[in-house]
Amino acid sequence: MTAASATTARVERIAMGVTCVATVVGIDSHDLAVRCLDLVEEIESLWSRFIPTSDISRLNSADGQPTVVDDRTLTLLHHMIAAHQATEGAYNPTRLPLQIAAGDTHSLINDRSTTLAANATVYSHLSGIQIFHDGKVSLPRGMTLDAGGIGKGLAADFILQFALEHGAQATCINLGGDMAINTGDSIGWDVEILSPLDPGVILDTVRISVGGVATSSLFARQRNSAGIASHLFTDSSAHDTQHTVGATVIANSAAWSEAWTKYAILSNPAQAIDTLTNTGLAAMLVSADGHTTKTESWKTFTHD
């Protein structure tokens, strides 16, 4: 009997408000890729602010009452807290009231919408989040969370691990630009970094063998005539679109990459490059005029 050989499957689906792509190398690669995208939808049902029964929606409407959530949601919350601390508050998942006030109330792919309680407010710290040993979580009254980009990044990390545990030899999970990759060798796969100003322009190509790469821009919640001009905020207002408008960060996970893109965009460019360099991260920033600024370590991932 001839042993089955590995094949490569690439399957895509719209979920989490973005195009999700699972690329899997292995035996039964197509079936595994489909299962990966099924898992995207399962995680979306836990974390979407547009689904009233999701863990995130239930926490946001609990008015401070302890709420039982999935173990994966507990992991998400721990990542949120760690990212908020590491980025000195640049990543802040409590800014949903600002997004809603700016008009970001509806899903970009269906007719679902988000409504918040009248007391919803932005918090400058996350120390009030209580995570109990029995799997319950309590948010301070008025705090609302948005899984957003870090949710997509963490979902990509979860699903990459799922694929590897189920026989994949190599996998790339790409959830709208938040990518978790393990090629199973040192060669790596090429990732094209597109301009946030013109998606038809490739700014650079990086090669990743293991880890995460995330690209974020101010315009991520804007599609055609829908959405808002800038979806990233400081604690009081939308970020000025005349400064950094997009960033790509390479790290050891998609979730961590995604969190640091927020820091990169919301910070002074020179300060961002210094901090990212000192943190050991490779990054590229894009300004409003299309100019790119890169950390010194960026070139270790390119073909130059």
Which residues are covered by each model-predicted region?
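Mature catalytic core of soluble alpha/beta enzymes
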Residues: 1-304
